[in-house]
Amino acid sequence: MILATTSSTFASLEEMVTVLSIDGGGIKGIIPGTILEFLEGQLQKMDNNADARLADYFDVIGGTSTGGLLTAMITTPNENNRPFAAANEIVPFYFEHGPHIFNSSTGQFFGPKYDGKYLMQVLQEKLGETRVHQALTEVAISSFDIKTNKPVIFTKSNLAKSPELDAKMYDICYSTAAAPTYFPPHYFATNTINGDKYKFNLVDGAVATVADPALLSVSVATRRAQEDPAFASIRSLNYKKMLLLSLGTGTTSEFDKTHTAEETAKWGALQWMLVIQQMTEAASSYMTDYYLSTVFQDLHSQNNYLRVQENALTGTTTKADDASEANMELLAQVGENLLKKPVSKDNPETYEEALKRFAKLLSDRKKLRANKASY
């Protein structure tokens, strides 16, 4: 549920800072891909512009793991300085390349499940030599450096102070997707402000931000507000001036029914290892959503935040690396069905209706800013 567009909101709408956040989740990126296709389609209809792209409407787009890949796809420029991928090309990308990225025949018993070679190959082909500074809007893509034991956040706004972060987009995308046990960590080097070599040893961004990067994306926006006049309205954490759309890759309603305290009391390290990551990711994603919902609500701006998430995945759709055609078809259907579901138990508005409202705000805001710039 989000702000209704009335004459009283237009004055403040122009000042709104818009943020899009996309979760990690491997092949489950098909779900937010479906949502993004719907949203971009609505924007194109409202603005009567088939070339309208999400990067034209969001001030910050952030993602981790597969969400980082989607972020790059919709913000990396092509030869015409437009996003190289439209939102309706995201799901076909997974269908074409997913089976090769998650090809079990390339894995080893001792070592990562997949060798990552095809993933790197397709990233290099699609993203070329493009670097962070060329992104068409502010980005926030996370990774984790296993040499320094610190998160690494790739954003445009950090480049003046830390030019070593101006890495190639394909290096960043592989790094944010390099989930331990699934893909090998990624090493690459850039140059510091003094010309020295700066070395990165990176793994999946979910290690740094878990699977939901919404807080990271908001933090990048508020930090940029200290220096960029375009973000001035959200200084002092004024979330009343922020529109946040957060897209999940789905969780399972069966998870909390799977185990009991009596059962797990007998578990050892191996049994816990099989489920602890799923537990941690589910809990962290819930807490991120809970925190943001609470903050926006306390500021009487709860309608400025929309979390789109499927909480009832079952069977193969819960797996981040099942890229069989049958499962990808199921994931695409999950995304389509999600649009028809209510936002929450307390809010009967469907996600489709909420996203249309969100699109209207984005469209109106863009027009207001364009009109102001023309004077």
From Swiss-Prot:
Coiled coil, from the record: 349-373
Domain PNPLA, chain residue ranges per copy: 20-218
UniProt motif DGA/G: location: 204-206
Pfam families given in the database record: Patatin
Residues carrying covalently attached carbohydrate according to the record: 103
Compartments, as annotated in UniProt: Vacuole
GO molecular function: monoacylglycerol lipase activity; nutrient reservoir activity; phospholipase activity
Leader sequence residues: 1-11
UniProt GO BP: defense response; lipid catabolic process
EC code: 3.1.1.-
Active site positions: 65 (nucleophile), 204 (proton acceptor)
Annotated motif GXGXXG, positions: 24-29
Predominant subcellular localization, coarse grouping: other
Record carries keyword Protein transport: no
Function comment: Probable lipolytic acyl hydrolase (LAH), an activity which is thought to be involved in the response of tubers to pathogens.
Family: Belongs to the patatin family.
Name of the protein: Patatin-1-Kuras 2
Source taxonomy: Eukaryota, Viridiplantae, Streptophyta, Embryophyta, Tracheophyta
